[in-house]
Amino acid sequence: MDNKIFITLGSQKFQFNRLLKAVDELCEKGTINAEDVFAQIGYSDYLPKNFSYKKFLDRDEFSNEMEKANIVITHGGTGAIIGAVKKGKKVIAVPRRAKYGEHVDDHQLQLIKQFDDLNLICSCQDTGKLDVALKTVQLTKYNSYESNTVNIINSIENYIKQIKV
């Protein structure tokens, strides 16, 4: 696979070892070229054996890694997903799960489902199927992100006009 992959796990104080281990296994099998992977692993205590990583990145480092990548594998955080989609990246989102100590609840399941339903990302609920998600993301044409800011401003302007009458 000759795709540059950036893995970003956010900065919340939860580990996401399960995802890092899955990527490590795919590198070991040769499914992913380890040289093409870089991860920002946050508070995870699993240290990848087969690909480069750093616990945290400053803003410039993060932007640089995002720019180099054409595939972003991320947790189900809204900011991480929207940031990658806005930059035109193919996104695989894997939800953090409470039962694995990755978050306090399972809200990321619903967030990822919404983005997937809008055809903005590839949802990967099971890290054991990450190889399938990587194939899917390469073959799928995703919708581009469109900001709703203009609609919100127009709605506010219309509301203001109505209350002035």
Question: Model-predicted segments: where are they?
Answer:
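Nucleotide-activated sugar donor-binding and catalytic core shared by glycosyltransferases
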Residues: 1-165
